[in-house]
Amino acid sequence: MSPEQNSILKVSKLVKRFGGFHALDGLSFHVVPGEILGLVGPNGSGKTTAINVISGLYAPDGGEVVFDGASSGGVASHKLVHRGINRTFQVPKPFLSLTVRENIQVALAYGGATGTPTSIAELLEEYRLKEVADRPAADLNSAQQKMLDLTRALATRPRLLLLDELAAGLNPAELDWIAGRIKALAATGMAIIVVEHLMGFIEQITDRVIVLNAGKEIFEGTLATAVREPQVIEVFLGGEHAH
């Protein structure tokens, strides 16, 4: 069976318009269980829009999204959480007046995941939130809010995890640490799609990347190969990444 046939997510000829602007213009790709796929490209290339359509925040205007063999395009976000898709956001939006622990409890209740519930205590320990578990989310620094956003998604036991700029604002030590956590999640069989501008981080964690421009794929393969492509180097990643 080919990797594409084994995919947990398949996006085919996806279109998303905002007025006359085509944010996605025939985008197609797939991801298999246990794979970390990076979506890269300049601002406005369609990376976050793709995540928003896959997660049910936006309905597609054309094309198809298939998750685990069933059409998922246009399905409401909370229903997709039940089916096994969850995500983080560029700017985390926790319930600021609730404690860290309560935020995760709300995510569990909202997600309604089947199977054994993820241990909140384990998540707090694993993602360095144990010491602030009973403090309001408003008290957290930016890195802690990112980790809370991630733990809320993980609490619902997703089979497909979408990470939108998770690394932004993290220091080098934090980046190395979270890279290890993401790779460990993939090792359990979780499929992960990463939208990110930090190419060093993408290189560290991804198995494969899709480079987008104007809502279309212009390259698919490893980042190591991408940085040798003149079009990718000059227009999307910047020439310094070729060295």
Regions found by a protein language model. Name each.
Residues 2-243:
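Glycine-rich phosphate-binding loops of nucleotide-dependent enzymes
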